[in-house]
Amino acid sequence: MQFIYLNIVRFTWFLGALSILFLDKLDFQRKINQIGNSGFDVVMRYLTHAGDGIFALLVLIALLFIRIKTALIALISFGLTAGIVQLLKHTFFKTMKRPYYFLQSDADFRFIEDFTYHTSNSFPSGHSASIFAICTVIAYQYKSKLSIQLILVIFAILVALTRVYLCQHFLQDIIAGSLIGTLIAYYASIFLEPKWNHLDKPLRLNE
């Protein structure tokens, strides 16, 4: 079966690129901020944690008991992704500011209660890179399962979009992050998956 997950991700990159070309990034952020509501605020502020390293660690542990091979490929993909993203954030793009830095002084800016806003190290989005790395590895392992691929790609996109909703990243940041995470995970899967067929089994603690 065709790797539908990757095709959908490519299409979202295309749509994102068009948006970046034709929309002013600050005006776009202002509109997103204004269309929000308290219900979305609750969902977004919790869903965004799926891009945290802690969430990735929990997924990796769970994967060990499903398929060791998948867990190891995900671990390598996540580690490489996190390293590259942090290198880019703190070297080449260390002066890049987050949307909140520019919008916090707007008179009609809609603040989310009890949410911690950050202002620096905007590019690329670490949360987006992390969730796409993890989801891409899992989706690759289930290439024959269309439903699993669709669930994973929708989940990854939603988690990345929370960063825009929360004014923590511009659209370009989450696209770059998703690009890094997806490509690293995809090529790691292609290279490592056939080499670790002997690990295509769950971890059993009683063995």
Regions found by a protein language model. Give the residues of each.
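N-terminal transmembrane-helix/juxtamembrane module of multi-pass inner/ER membrane proteins
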Residues: 1-57, 89-117
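Interfacial segments of alpha-helical transmembrane regions
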Residues: 5-6, 59-90
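Alpha-helical transmembrane segments of integral membrane proteins
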Residues: 5-9, 69-77, 148-152, 172-176
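Aromatic-anchored segments of alpha-helical transmembrane domains
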Residues: 17-23, 79-87, 154-167
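Membrane-water interface at transmembrane helix exits
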Residues: 29, 64, 85-93, 139, ...
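Membrane-helix interface segments
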Residues: 37-40, 67-71, 144-149
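Hydrophobic alpha-helical transmembrane segments
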Residues: 48-67, 127-132
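Membrane-embedded catalytic cores of phosphoryl/pyrophosphoryl-handling enzymes
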Residues: 106-207
